[in-house]
Design a protein with these regions (language model features):
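Residue-level detector of flexible, active-site-proximal loop/helix-junction positions
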Residues: 77, 219, 227
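ABC family nucleotide-binding domain
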Residues: 3-209, 214-216
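ABC-family P-loop ATPase nucleotide-binding domain
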Residues: 1-11, 222-230
Length: 230
């Protein structure tokens, strides 16, 4: 099966004299997988996600996403690649409060050169799919946490990315909103979206994972399929 992510001997050191924060690590993620990354604080989860997202560069090794070795791209090329191929969802939404829901969602498409009409059509399609069309002209500050996270997911998907990265997407939500976002991630995976999810929430991990890796001190301590670490 096609590999969306390939990490080849990847290590990241923040202190040249200390142990790596991550790795060395060799890991592949196949198209359509929902990979959940768990582990204690400081285990390397955020470092792994940042390397895959191209938000940081490895000290050693190769990071290949959607067939491109992103650790060797220039900053300009990397930013363009990220906009086109990687969608990201964070704990605190990162929406622009002075833009409407529709404008927030279609902005990444416009940044990649998509025409306004086509971007608006894609935003409308996603709002319908995610159950937020009634909020099209609203501003994010008027929405609940769960609704804002749905807007963030729609924005992440607007360019039809090969990969969706989610970092503690329910961490700032109440229980009901968290369940809504969990169900949304499950539905996206069932529709074939490749997902990498970092979470401390065992229930979220169990619901979403087709595969789970558990990190300890920057290394994979456990790699399991069709079940989550509890």
């Amino acid at each position: 099966m096609h590999q969306v992510i390939e990490l080849q001997g990847v290590a990241k050191r923040y202190d040249s004299a200390g142990a790596p924060a991550l790795g060395p690590l060799t890991l592949g993620v196949a198209e359509g997988e929902a990979l959940v990354v768990t582990g204690p604080s400081g285990s390397g989860k955020s470092t792994l996600l940042n390397l895959v997202a191209g938000l940081d560069r490895p000290t050693d090794g190769a990071v290949i996403v959607a067939g491109r070795r992103i650790d060797q791209l220039s900053e300009h090329a990397l930013a363009k690649f990220r906009r086109e191929h990687i969608g990201m969802v964070f704990q605190f939404f990162n929406l622009l409060d002075d833009l409407t829901v529709t404008d927030n969602i279609q902005l990444p498409a416009q940044l990649t050169g998509t025409g306004r009409r086509e971007a608006a059509a894609r935003a409308g399609e996603l709002m319908e799919m995610l159950g937020i069309r009634r909020h099209a002209r609203a501003y994010p500050g008027r929405l609940s946490g769960g609704e804002r996270q749905r807007v963030a997911v729609a924005r992440a998907l607007v360019n039809r990315p090969a990969l969706l990265l989610a970092d503690e997407p329910t961490g700032a939500l109440d229980t009901a909103s968290g369940h809504d976002v969990r169900d949304l991630l499950v539905d996206l995976h069932r529709a074939g979206q490749t997902v990498v999810l970092v979470t401390h929430d065992p229930a979220l991990a169990e619901a979403c994972a087709s595969r789970t890796i558990h990190l300890v001190d920057g290394h994979v301590a456990l790699d399991t399929y069709a079940q989550a670490v509890r």
